[in-house]
């Protein structure tokens, strides 16, 4: 089987939406019956984004096999059925780390190790490995053409196109086509210069995606085609839209998938986008709306919670309601009090690290519990709910996590020192372990209690969810908390770790150690988020009476 590659680059400015464009194109090709996957190549020197600040980089998306990856992989999984893995994302840091390890072992037999051929060969090997078994692979190159960091990746894909044959390789370039109000027209010169920059590297784009706040007129697209040496039908206008789920239809309407299939000589049926049309219909025709407060510490960059925000929207689609998300800084709860939580239909506390703002989260969990407001806690959101219950219901004054107060009297949350990974191997950690790549990561099995709310929501007794944490409920103190009324609704497959807790005498209070947002999609949603949004809607109706 021959694998075809589409290399996706961006020019002029960053944040044009390469990830959304690649994912949308992949969704169309998948709808034509093709086996598609997407890769993201990041030029930064970090080995992975696992230890990067969420405020700088956005969320860390965790794959089933436990890789900590770029948030674009979340977009990929929300648009296509193919599951991402550690093969779908790698960085400059990972490449250099691998090459230097080989050099130390003597694998290069005394050769002078250089960017060309050693670094570029390592990049090509990983791209080919990630594409095995697929009809089409989209490879997104992070950054902007012209960045010094991107040069080894651009050189590698230039070589790769020659290696596999140009009949199996396409270059798709996203550029900005700005509209100047003073002139009353869009300007194509930035696109021309961006393509010129690509040509200087040896890459002639085959497809140009023109990003603008409005549709790029046909005469301007013809002008771009002429000056950039690209067929006119391969100059695609991608205007701003009110929903990213409209992009597949926008690209298909301009024949992009037909052009690609002809170039690759792929015989496949027309794309059926009815599932996406249904998503767009549900999004545009809600029967109501709810307001959900998300209390976190990284709210100045919403992308830090990208998958959670999307999962809440998916929950809204499943309930035919619009979800208005109010981002609340947990430190504001500490300084201004729980008054700022009034008028919310539900409260969610997402994952996070560090002591800053944690008391505000604990106060938020208490407010939700005592006022019968639907509550969903994720990762740290479960831990603060447990700490709050231990302090205020179980009589364990000053209960805390050893992450925040190492010598606290009641360490109800503590470091996991031992667990089994996805392959069944025992992992061991201590306080002295490195921060990077040392958490309990990836898909893990969870057994649900028969009498639990989550058992009803999932409709199954065993589930698999993705994790990213190094602290867990302390089983040594669990019995005292359970005796006070807290329900353990889910445990790990080996019965060693608490995965889900519930407050039984509450309309809807669920907190989980795993990250359900990573498996929520617009077409399928997720049981927890669908149930949570439904509970928010029901709470709103009760309050209106």
Swiss-Prot record:
Single GO BP term: 'de novo' CTP biosynthetic process
Gene Ontology MF, one: metal ion binding
Record: residues binding L-glutamine: 352, 380-383, 403, 470
Domain Glutamine amidotransferase type-1 positions: 291-542
Active site (UniProt): 379 (nucleophile), 515, 517
Pathway it works in: Pyrimidine metabolism; CTP biosynthesis via de novo pathway; CTP from UDP: step 2/2
Binding site for Mg(2+): 72, 140
Residues that hold ATP according to the record: 15-20, 72, 239-241
Keyword Transmembrane assigned: no
EC top class, as a word: ligase
Catalytic reaction list: UTP + L-glutamine + ATP + H2O = CTP + L-glutamate + ADP + phosphate + 2 H(+); L-glutamine + H2O = L-glutamate + NH4(+); UTP + NH4(+) + ATP = CTP + ADP + phosphate + 2 H(+)
PROSITE patterns to which the protein is assigned, alphabetical: GATASE_TYPE_1
Cross-referenced Gene3D superfamilies: 3.40.50.880, P-loop containing nucleotide triphosphate hydrolases
Miscellaneous comment as given in the Swiss-Prot or TrEMBL entry: CTPSs have evolved a hybrid strategy for distinguishing between UTP and CTP. The overlapping regions of the product feedback inhibitory and substrate sites recognize a common feature in both compounds, the triphosphate moiety. To differentiate isosteric substrate and product pyrimidine rings, an additional pocket far from the expected kinase/ligase catalytic site, specifically recognizes the cytosine and ribose portions of the product inhibitor.
Reported function: Catalyzes the ATP-dependent amination of UTP to CTP with either L-glutamine or ammonia as the source of nitrogen. Regulates intracellular CTP levels through interactions with the four ribonucleotide triphosphates.
Protein name: CTP synthase
Organism: Salmonella schwarzengrund (strain CVM19633)
Gene designation per UniProt: pyrG
């Amino acid at each position: 089987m021959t694998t075809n590659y589409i290399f996706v680059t961006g020019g002029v400015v960053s944040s044009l939406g390469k990830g959304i464009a690649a994912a949308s194109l992949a969704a169309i090709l998948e709808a034509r019956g093709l086996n598609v996957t997407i890769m993201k190549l990041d030029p930064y020197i970090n080995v992975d984004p696992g230890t990067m600040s969420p405020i700088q980089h956005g969320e860390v998306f965790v794959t089933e096999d436990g890789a900590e990856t770029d948030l674009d992989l979340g977009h990929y999984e929300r648009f296509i059925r193919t599951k991402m893995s550690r093969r779908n994302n790698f960085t400059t840091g990972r490449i250099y780390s691998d090459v230097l390890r080989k050099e130390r072992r003597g694998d290069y037999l005394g050769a002078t190790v250089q960017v060309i051929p050693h670094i570029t060969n390592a990049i090509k090997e990983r791209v080919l490995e990630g594409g095995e078994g697929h009809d089409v692979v989209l490879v997104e190159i992070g950054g902007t053409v012209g960045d010094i960091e991107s040069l080894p990746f651009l050189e590698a894909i230039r070589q790769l196109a020659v290696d596999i044959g140009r009949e199996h390789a396409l270059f798709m370039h996203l550029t900005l086509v700005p509209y100047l109000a003073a002139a009353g027209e869009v300007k194509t010169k930035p696109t021309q210069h961006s393509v010129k920059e690509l040509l200087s590297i040896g890459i002639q784009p085959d497809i140009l995606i023109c990003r603008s706040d409005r549709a790029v007129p046909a005469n301007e697209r013809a002008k771009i085609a002429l000056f950039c040496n690209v067929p006119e039908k391969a100059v695609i206008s991608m205007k701003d839209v009110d929903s990213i789920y409209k992009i597949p239809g926008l690209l298909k309407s301009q024949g992009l998938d037909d052009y690609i299939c002809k170039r690759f000589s792929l015989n496949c049926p027309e794309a059926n986008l009815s599932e996406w049309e249904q998503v767009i219909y549900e999004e545009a025709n809600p029967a109501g709306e709810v307001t959900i407060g998300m209390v976190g510490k990284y709210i100045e960059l919403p992308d830090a919670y990208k998958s959670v925000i999307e999962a809440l929207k998916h929950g809204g689609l499943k309930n035919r309601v619009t979800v208005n998300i109010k981002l609340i800084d947990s430190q504001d709860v500490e300084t201004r009090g729980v008054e700022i939580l009034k008028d919310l239909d539900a409260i969610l506390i997402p994952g996070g690290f560090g002591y800053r703002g944690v008391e505000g989260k604990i106060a938020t969990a208490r407010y939700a519990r005592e006022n019968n407001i639907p509550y969903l806690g994720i990762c740290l959101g479960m831990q603060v709910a447990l700490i709050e219950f231990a302090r205020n219901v179980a009589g364990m004054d000053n209960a805390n996590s050893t992450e925040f107060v190492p010598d606290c009297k009641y360490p109800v949350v503590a470091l996991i020192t031992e667990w089994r990974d996805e392959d069944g191997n025992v992992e061991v950690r201590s306080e002295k372990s490195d921060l990077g790549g040392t958490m309990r990561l990836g898909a893990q099995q969870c057994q649900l209690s028969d009498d639990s709310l989550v058992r009803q929501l999932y409709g199954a007794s065993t589930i698999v969810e993705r994790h990213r944490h190094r602290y867990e409920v302390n089983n040594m103190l669990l019995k005292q908390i359970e005796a006070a009324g807290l329900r353990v609704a889910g445990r790990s497959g080996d019965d060693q770790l608490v995965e889900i807790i519930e407050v039984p005498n509450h309309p809807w209070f669920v907190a989980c150690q795993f990250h359900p947002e990573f498996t929520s999609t617009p077409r399928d949603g997720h049981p927890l988020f669908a149930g949570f949004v439904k509970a928010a809607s029901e709470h709103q109706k009760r309050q209106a009476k």
